[in-house]
Amino acid sequence: MAEEQEFTQLCKLPVQPSHPHCVNNTYRSAQHSQALLRGLLALRDSGILFDVVLVVEGRHIEAHRILLAASCDYFRGMFAGGLKEMEQEEVLIHGVSYNAMCQILHFIYTSELELSLSNVQETLVAACQLQIPEIIHFCCDFLMSWVDEENILDVYRLAELFDLSRLTEQLDTYILKNFVAFSRTDKYRQLPLEKVYSLLSSNRLEVSCETEVYEGALLYHYTLEQVQADQISLHEPPKLLETVRFPLMEAEVLQRLHDKLDPSPLRDTVANALMYHRNESLQPSLQGPHTELRSDFQCVVGFGGIHSTPSTVLSDQAKYLNPLLGEWKHFTASLAPRMSNQGIAVLNNFVYLIGGDNNVQGFRAESRCWRYDPRHNRWFQIQSLQQEHADLCVCVVGRYIYAVAGRDYHNDLNAVERYDPTTNSWAYVAPLKREVYAHAGATLEGKMYVTCGRRGEDYLKETHCYDPDSNTWHSLADGPVRRAWHGMATLLDKLYVIGGSNNDAGYRRDVHQVACYSCTSGQWSSVCPLPAGHGEPGIAVLDTRIYVLGGRSHNRGSRTGYVHIYDVEKDCWEEGPQLDNSISGLAACVLTLPRTLLLEPPRGTPDRSQADPDFASEVMSVSDWEEFDNSSED
């Protein structure tokens, strides 16, 4: 008794913990589940506590009822669902081989499954009957590791027999990845027409050009020799040709095909595709399923900008964040002169670069505009703005592109121009009530929102909203902080204002505060601040994440190459793949890029600023920070 009292006194704990977070803790063992499995396996190996016998092909297998019920729906229903097997000591299992049952029980007790070509089919049959998804997945993965052109039809039949949608998808992916080679085999022509039609309609079909799809459609009906010798009849075109996206084919190829066709529905289809190529200015308004890229790679893309090297030079290279490699790659040289701070818009997967700063031989505002088409890796100069706009913002509302205010380096602007892709023309709409430049804009629910910026030497925190239906502007609640040369993004029905700088401290400083505007409440709030300064950043939204690319940090006194990504669901920032150079004034967006671009080595001319060290002298010869007196962030 004395010992018990002494122990109680030694272990006496405070009634009220001194730290408020020390009331209780929950501990979790990472090793417990494996230790439990080892214990159950030891019971099995020792023949202890067995309470059921499975009779499979006339042979007995002892097991633990509770473990079987916990492992799969089949046994759970049998032993815990009120069936007669609940009370039986011996349970007869039908439709499963003894060897497969032993394999499955070994997995249940160890989480390990050994598969081979000799046992995978019977194991799969058993797993489907016993409803064990993990084993089904393992069997499907094993089968896929052995799939080739000779056995793929057999595996398709197996997938259909057991309704294995995941295996069917894996087989489809195999053909999509190897389509050009597979379409030249006899097995290809043995696939059901509906299956081939579905595959040829897929955006995931891996081909280097649309001509390969055209040939693949013909190879389902003709041999390779017949196709190459042009021994085919197209007067009544095969149904599979409906899947060919003729506008994606090169104009020269289409013309040759058109010239050799007799009058037929196919000839009319090819003629329409040729008209698509000839009406280059109208292509964005001629989009449909047959002009859609065969790709599901949405990438963050950046154009132009000024980057820091021994001299301040500009980039004519576009760059994209490769989602497969997690790094930045160059993919096209811009038709536009070396520029920065261009307005950027995406309409029907065409990129528009609007106005901005023409930085060749000093700084001046630009009125010219360009359009990039990733389908054909082609640039096109569209109609110029009616006046020069530098430090502007650009938004897409409906089917129009709006260029809002800015400056021309003589005057601040309040003019707003609207671009109509169907007529390739700009027209003035209602101007802002007052001039502003170095502002930012975004679109939400059919309206355009513009925030902050500068007027003269003053930094602003104003918010304005444009309603295209009434062609009117109205003012909203001011943002929480003055800023300019920032970015805006729309995500999950809210507007985010990110980066920039101001002189509230009496000198230029970065703004780290990130403001969030709710159109529903009409109020501003703050979210997780930026971890570093981003003035003149590129801004792009992909999925539920906002990418902030490069820019200038006035706190550091330099341009930056870092990338920060905001996760709106977690309200936190993380570091992204760093740009290959410190750069500001990058025009960024999200674009669907061709699959071949991501899977092949980069093509095109190198950035002249990198290839020719003397080129810098053609542009500027001032230091990285001293040029700011005349630059965008003056």
UniProtKB/Swiss-Prot annotation:
It holds the Pfam family BACK. GO terms for biological process: cell division; cellular response to L-leucine; mitotic sister chromatid segregation; mitotic spindle assembly checkpoint signaling; negative regulation of autophagy; positive regulation of cell growth; positive regulation of TORC1 signaling; proteasome-mediated ubiquitin-dependent protein catabolic process. The modification N-acetylalanine is found at A2. Residues 50-117 form the BTB domain. PROSITE patterns: BTB. Keywords: Acetylation, Cell cycle, Cell division, Cytoplasm, Cytoskeleton, Kelch repeat, Lysosome, Mitosis, Nucleus, Phosphoprotein, Repeat, Ubl conjugation pathway. The keyword Cell division applies. Residues 600-634 are annotated as: Disordered. It is found in: Cytoplasm, Cytosol; Cytoplasm, Cytoskeleton, Microtubule organizing center, Centrosome; Cytoplasm, Cytoskeleton, Spindle; Nucleus. Pathway: Protein modification; protein ubiquitination. Residues 624-634 have a biased composition (Acidic residues). The modification Phosphotyrosine is found at Y466. Kelch repeats lie at residues 299-349, 350-399, 400-446, 448-493, 494-544, 545-593. The modification Phosphothreonine is found at T463, T605. One of its GO terms (cellular component) is mitotic spindle. Signal peptide: none annotated. Substrate-specific adapter of a BCR (BTB-CUL3-RBX1) E3 ubiquitin ligase complex required for chromosome alignment and localization of PLK1 at kinetochores. The BCR(KLHL22) ubiquitin ligase complex mediates monoubiquitination of PLK1, leading to PLK1 dissociation from phosphoreceptor proteins and subsequent removal from kinetochores, allowing silencing of the spindle assembly checkpoint (SAC) and chromosome segregation. Monoubiquitination of PLK1 does not lead to PLK1 degradation. Component of the BCR(KLHL22) E3 ubiquitin ligase complex, at least composed of CUL3, KLHL22 and RBX1. Interacts with PLK1. Interacts with DEPDC5 (via DEP domain); the interaction depends on amino acid availability. Interacts with YWHAE; required for the nuclear localization of KLHL22 upon amino acid starvation. This is Kelch-like protein 22. It comes from Ailuropoda melanoleuca (Giant panda). The gene is KLHL22.
